[in-house]
């Protein structure tokens, strides 16, 4: 669906490799060979700032009784941007990063206190299946989040089902991470 949507807007789509790292390496090779511009999908200050506008929208829609925000994480651009904005404007709001257990590169990095490259990642939540958190995103995230929640494939599937039952929309697995994290947090905190 994503690829077709991009093609429908007139872009030439080049699919290469089975992992994000393989696709990124190929894109950088094309940049060198053909003089193209490479815009990193998450580890770029402008991309992070752009994704931070989601945090602005959240605060506009919920100006008062907002206690916590749960953000899906792959490479970390969305999480870094949203967390930086919300913590600057509303430092009282808790920020939780949510990852699939099979691609929990942020949780590993937070535990080791440095970026860690996972030997392999699962592809169920393919939109967030990244082996290593971004360098700039990790720098921002480690200063702005209150915790990392990892969720299983079963927890993600349950959240996809919940979203469908509530909205009649089918969420992709990465799109259901935040709800899965919220549900796990609520259960652990007996909320």
Show the residue positions of the predicted features.
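PLP-dependent amino-acid enzyme catalytic core
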Residues: 1-191
